[in-house]
Amino acid sequence: METVVNQIKSKLPENLEGLLDLAYNYWWSWNRRATKLWEKIDPEHWWEYKNPVKLLLDTPEERLKELSKDDDFINLYELVIDQFRHYMNPESTWFSTNYPKWEEPVIYLCMEYGISKSLPIYSGGLGILAGDHIKTASDLGIPLIAIGLLYKHGYFKQEIDKDGKQIEVFPEYNPEEMPIKPLTTEKGKPLLIEVPIEDRIVYARAFEVNVGRVKLYLLDTDVPQNSPDDRTICDYLYNAEIDKRIKQEILLGIGGMRLLRMLGIDPAVIHLNEGHPAFANFQRIAWYMEEGLNFLEALTVVRGTTIFTTHTPVPAGHDKFPIAEVEKRLAKFLEGLPKDEFLNLGREGDQFNMTLLSIRTSSYVNAVSKLHSKVTKEMWRHLWNGVPLDEIPVEGITNGVHTKTWLHNEIKKLVDRYIGRVWRDYAELEGLWYGVERIPDEELWEAHLKAKREFIELIKRKIKERNERLGIEEPLPEIDENALIIGFARRFATYKRATLILTDLERLKKIVNNPERPVYIIFGGKAHPRDEAGKEFLRKVYEVSQMPEFKNKIMVFENYDMGSARAMVAGVDVWLNNPRRPLEASGTSGMKAGLNGVLNLSVYDGWWVEGYNGKNGWVIGDESLEPETEKDNIRDAQSLYNLLENEVIPTYYENRARWIYMMKESIKSIAPRFSTHRMVKEYVDKFYSKALANAILLQRDSFKATREIASWKAKIFNSWDKVEIERIITHDATGVEVIVNLDGLSPEDVKVEIYYGVKAEGYAIEKPYVIELKHPQSLGGNRWLYRYEGNALKNLGHPCWHYAVRVYPYHDKLPHKFLLGLIKWKGFFEL
């Protein structure tokens, strides 16, 4: 790699030397002027690769000398370099202003990152979200360090054959041509970390990726010190082989922590983005045990300082492995450690569940939308058996998108002109975006048409490349930029229902072939290599697109990636999203589209439950939150056709003023609320800051608080089975007495409460009231009498009201009162 840097250095003219540092920092990927600068060097090369390191390597020295004398290029270069230096060395940031004494890093771990097309280590929404998260952490000045894996073949490059069958192509990427650098020792040799897997040590090298002010470290086992098989651990993202998948997750979690230690970084607070990296907490527990803590004490520290984000209710998104397979691959790591206690953290019958491990080792758990929070609580409520759903400690922090990455350049220009550049630092301020109203309709429409033209050119280019590869000789489609274009692009997972719009082909034929109001529908997306049902959906869409009545009206393009996504989310008129509720935990593609004034046509699920306001798009089906089944497909398809025929198409063609009004409404309502600036600030305020406070508390005075809390937990676990609410005695509607047997616990170890309110379904209570019972009287023999007098009991006996008493363990140093998931109940009239 050093030779690559030297190669570039040796041919850069002196007045263009700044291009080297710029090329190795992904800041350029969200800066309009910087991408324009790279494009000026070689437009065709930039279109193909979007990789400044490869661009500089491949550009002849003569061309660089020519540019060094080009006044226009030099002026742009100096402007970009000046912006870059100011960004990297700010006087202050949001974080430094709001948390001036915070220096400890937050460690962020994820299996994939979508930073740019030139770093193909992502497959879909999880990776794109992770990329947007760390870009925003950079913008806000958060001391965040990210860890991932470097995949030799990435995910896969998609080709579609003449029959519509997906072909997975796995190109081999050369790290030396990427904007990444290897970490080296003082002697210039590759820095290697040692990761115990099975009965041996596996070595991994590390690469550093600069994402603005944030460091992303990527691990890879393709080094000569490893066996041929171990060298292939990082060959493929989401390797379907159980053996490789477990090893990848050990490498990410345990290896990631060991890399930090080699770099002298203390992982005081960590954020697990999905369950894949959860073995990181095994390593942290082991290290704390080396410092003299027992297992429960070490777990207390680790759990109190870990954040876990779960992204999907779909079972395929929650890794499970046979526990024997996990034990085999952790054999060397677990030597000398209490094996069963470690494995029990993820044990689910004979399976080891990575999500379960993540939850059991995290104090701060969140889903990625408000609806997904409810779904997640229901999905995992057995871990908090008896705790009311609304009190289960799973927060909803709705996803967002990195505005500077996803806002189209033409829209950026308008926003700069009519709102001011301040949005770049304060994208989450809702009042700011009301300035969109100042944009003249004709200017917004022209900017939108430019985005459409760009996307149309991309589609034609992709179709041409495919035709040439397959030897297909036919004219390219003529796509009218003034016609309505509907876009559908995402993973071809069956629950996303790509074929829903194909339910009634006769009706669809009339919709797309109206000569006065033509409609194009453009599909993009990959099916997982092992998802045969998803591949069949893709084949079905392609098959319909080749029917004479749909030819060049419905189109499918290959290899949907970040580059095509950026063009598509701004270059269509309508963004179609029709998953089966509630399986779309959040979804972010619609946010990106809405940000650009593209109108969402979506099922009421995920983020759209919060985003839809009646003026910024349409809802397919109803606004219910009830789960859907396959039986609802016909209903939703009919709703989709009705909306297209009666609202979407007529508005687009007959009421342009209304359409542009909705575009502005979309931008101003979606841009601030669904920005990662809002999202990441929520993580800092709600989770990171509290986890850091816990880290300080738990490690202070040689882990004094840790030992106290762990000792208390052990006492609770030992006595809880025998704790009992023995009796409830009511005195008309004025008072109640409760007798509780606390076994070996004291009243200070628990809270006893009256819980009451209007009955809802089953035993649920709508908007419950809680009264804590205090000052108990000892009855001897571990039995305590709690009393209450007051008017809260006035509805006692009413058939619509329910009263109960509950008792649960309580410690004021726990992050959540229900962290242990223990609670006992007794209804007032139970016999």
UniProtKB/Swiss-Prot annotation:
Q: Which reactions does this protein catalyse?
A: [(1->4)-alpha-D-glucosyl](n) + phosphate = [(1->4)-alpha-D-glucosyl](n-1) + alpha-D-glucose 1-phosphate
Could you tell me the EC number(s) of this protein?
2.4.1.1
Thermal dependence of function as given in the entry: Optimum temperature is 98 degrees Celsius.
> What enzyme category does the UniProt record give?
transferase
Any one of the GO BP annotations: maltose metabolic process
Question: What does the induction field say?
Answer: Expressed constitutively.
The N6-(pyridoxal phosphate)lysine modification is found at: K592
Which cofactors does this protein require? Answer: pyridoxal 5'-phosphate
An example Gene Ontology molecular-function term? glycogen phosphorylase activity
List the keywords (alphabetical): Allosteric enzyme, Carbohydrate metabolism, Glycosyltransferase, Maltose metabolism, Pyridoxal phosphate, Transferase
Q: What Pfam family is a match for this entry?
A: Phosphorylase
Q: Which family does it belong to?
A: Belongs to the glycogen phosphorylase family.
What functional role does this protein have? Answer: Phosphorylase is an important allosteric enzyme in carbohydrate metabolism. Catalyzes the phospholytic cleavage of maltodextrins with a minimal chain length of five glucose residues to yield glucose-1-phosphate. Low activity with tetraose and no activity with triose and maltose. Long maltodextrins (8 to 15 glucose units), amylose and starch are not as good substrates as maltoheptaose.
Q: Which NCBIfam families match?
A: maldex_phorlase_Thcocales, more_P_ylases
Query: What interactions and quaternary structure are annotated?
Result: Trimer (at 25 degrees Celsius).
Q: Which PANTHER family match?
A: GLYCOGEN PHOSPHORYLASE
Write down what this protein is called. Maltodextrin phosphorylase
Q: Which organism is it from?
A: Thermococcus litoralis (strain ATCC 51850 / DSM 5473 / JCM 8560 / NS-C)
Source lineage: Archaea, Methanobacteriati, Methanobacteriota, Thermococci, Thermococcales
Q: Which gene encodes it?
A: malP
